[in-house]
Amino acid sequence: MADNDSISVRISEDCPPEIQRMLTAAWAHDVDTVKKLIDTPEVARGQDPKTGESPLHAAIRSCGAPSEDDTPEDHEKAKATVSELLMWGAIWNDVDNNNETPGCVAARLNRPELYELCVNAGVRAEMLFGLMDGYEALDSDDEDDEEMAEGEEAQAEDGEEAPELVAAEEATQTAEEETPAVFQPPAVNLEEQVTSDKYLRSTVAYSDGKLVDDAGNGVMMAWETDIMRRSVDALLPNKEPGKRILNIGFGMGIIDGMFAETKPAVHHIIEAHPEVLEYISTPESKFDSTWEESGPAPGAYRVWEGKWQQIGLQLLEEGHVYDAIYFDTFGEDYGQLRMFFTEYIPGLLDSNGIFGFFNGLGADRQICYDVYTKVAEMHLADAGLDVEWKEIPVDMKELAEADKDGWEGVKRRYWTLDTYRLPVCTFLG
């Protein structure tokens, strides 16, 4: 076991006693003690204030890499400990000071069964969040709180309860001074979230084989070309001319250029960013007004300007149907993709059509990618869609070479994995 994976390193001197006891029991796979110590989910989620070690991290890390000394009993005790912690609400994607989740540790140590337990916990959590999405949380007795506050103010005005208010302030100050240190995740996880609205208000630049916004976020990059080519091959298996195609998100125009080569009967593009639309209007993009006028019929080749949420409704109302649909937007979370294939695809995709999307869900971390693959598959099935995942190798060594990868000037790499899972979706049955 590496020195930085030892218990003496992972449990710091500043670790509160109750968390230290829990980490030690989890490390030893002492399930009975773990059960005795856990009385609330918070106990299962406690982290060392310096290392970020959680009981889940500890239970997995202590296994080390597989060796001849491993016994079936040791393995079962480790699985039982991890399962118990997850049952009590241990968080599958909490990171430590090495920016590793418990699943990341399991993958690094080549512990596939423990890794799978973390993946399944992630799937359960994300499916639960999906069920809760759209429901407004109940207020926590706001009116009662206001009434109590008003009562306290009235008593203070009478002068009878003022000393208690002073005492309360002193107690609060003392409590703040005694508040134990809380682990702060690595800065890489504290970056500002990019939203669709922020992106649409941003300035973008096309340069050196990439499209980047003014915050340095990579919107699209040339390394995706092979993925786009394979996506076109999957959406249009025989490259037959005369197909009806819809693409959401123009980006650099990589996939639209490939679609255009097949000489479709209908080729519609939805794009919302003003500066991307300005670029499209130039001859350099190859999708300006000249391209629109080259269609086999008026409106057959068209760039729809606006958000897909509104344009999609218009297409549905006008009865448009497509043989191939591709979805690749920027700054939107998984919920928007799910809404598209749940509410829009049933009406826009031909019964024999094929739907695909850029699968970058959680692609900066393997366990997140694995979790979202399973979650998306379940939600696609709920929407009446079957999905086949085509695995495409990504040469990360080549991408890592500074003179080849084109990542210079990009704030964060949104892709770090060796394999891309390309989704090919068709209607069930």
Swiss-Prot record:
Keyword Methyltransferase included in the entry's annotation: yes
Biased composition (Low complexity): 164-174
Gene Ontology CC terms, in alphabetical order: cytoplasm; nucleus
Biological-process GO terms, alphabetical: methylation
Region feature Disordered, mapped onto this chain: 41-76, 137-180
Primary location: cytoplasm
Function field: S-adenosyl-L-methionine-dependent protein-arginine N-methyltransferase that methylates the delta-nitrogen atom of arginine residues to form N5-methylarginine (type IV) in target proteins. Monomethylates ribosomal protein L12.
Family matches, as PANTHER family: GUANIDINOACETATE N-METHYLTRANSFERASE
Protein name: Protein arginine N-methyltransferase 2
Classification of source organism: Eukaryota, Fungi, Dikarya, Ascomycota, Pezizomycotina
